A protein has these predicted regions:
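Glycine-rich, highly charged phosphate/nucleotide-binding loops
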Residues: 35-50, 271-280
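A charged, amphipathic alpha-helical module
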Residues: 109, 116-243
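Anionic-ligand anchoring segments at beta-strand to alpha-helix junctions in alpha/beta enzyme folds, i.e.
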Residues: 14-35
Length: 290
């Protein structure tokens, strides 16, 4: 996964925006720097960056996904970044393992520490100490508890919240500073609990939205406009998995515990382990029976 970062430390950072370039009309400039044989997604990102669409960024942090994506970020760093207003803006890559082993966890921690946290601290003076990480995890956990409680309301026969409304709230928890949104999430939870639902449910059927990187709200709106109520989700940037509480003890290294949590709980099918490849399927069946 590649994400764009704006300055600060929320649950490791303040604002996160996924690499997107909607409504791209031309790849002319990007095709000059890349090949016209490379995928349109990568060229769209380069095109948008050169146009100035990412000028609000302080950093780009990504992973080694594919050669085309690596080339895309290299072009952003060399061609677009020098013209961005923030001259401290940096691009960094993390080599994230796709197998849950002791040695892969050590490698994961080393990558996040050296390629991400240390660079943030050196460039912007961001506090990445154990104390700061623990505080970030505490705020993260508060958000996760609230969003999970709201999400569970979708299981009711006559839910007080739509799948679209929940998708909006859940995306907010991924993008916005936790300390800023917590008061509003608490207010929203209280308001939803007090809602009076219609005597008859509005939907014609109940469905689960299953997939990979789904962060387009219009897709959720389209499904529910057709009369289907989205009562569960299982996709990247969704709530299950994704909004689980991170349990920390007082003895082990904080960053190691955080990395271990994500390495073990993620259900990315790109993992090399067979059990990880099968996890999304079994988890989907579990959610359906709920």
């Amino acid at each position: 996964r590649d994400c764009l970062l704006s300055r600060g430390l929320g649950d490791v950072y303040k604002r996160q925006v996924r690499l997107r370039a909607p409504k791209t009309g031309s790849f002319d400039i990007a095709s000059y720097y890349m090949s016209n044989y490379t995928c349109e997604y990568c060229r769209a990102l380069v095109e948008r960056a050169i146009e100035g669409g990412y000028n609000f960024l302080d950093a780009i942090a990504g992973v080694d996904a594919c050669a085309e994506m690596n080339r895309c970020m290299e072009n952003i760093e060399l061609v677009a970044a020098p013209d961005m207003p923030n001259k401290k803006m940096f691009v960094t890559h993390c080599d994230i393992p796709y197998k849950v082993k002791d040695y892969t966890l050590k490698h994961y921690v080393k990558q996040i520490r050296n390629r991400f946290l240390n660079v943030l601290a050196e460039t912007y003076g961001v506090d990445t100490s154990d104390k700061a990480l623990r505080k970030a995890v505490k705020e993260h956990n508060e958000v996760c508890k609230i969003i999970t409680e709201i999400g569970d309301m979708r299981k009711l026969e006559n839910p007080p919240i739509t799948g679209y409304e929940f998708h909006v709230l859940n995306l907010v928890t991924y993008c916005c500073p936790k300390s800023k949104i917590l008061p509003y999430l608490k207010e929203t939870l209280a308001e939803i609990k007090k809602r009076k639902v219609d005597a008859k449910p509005w939907y014609r059927c109940r469905v689960a939205l299953i997939g990979s990187e789904i962060d387009d709200l219009d897709m959720t709106r389209m499904v529910e406009d057709a009369g289907a109520m989205i009562v569960a989700d299982r996709f990247c940037f969704g709530s299950t998995p994704g909004r689980e509480v991170i349990e920390l003890n007082d003895t082990d290294d904080v960053l190691t515990q955080i990395c271990a949590h994500y390495l073990k709980t993620t259900q990315c099918p790109r993992y090399m382990s067979q059990e990880k490849i099968q996890e999304p399927v079994s988890y989907t069946h579990l959610r359906a029976h709920e």
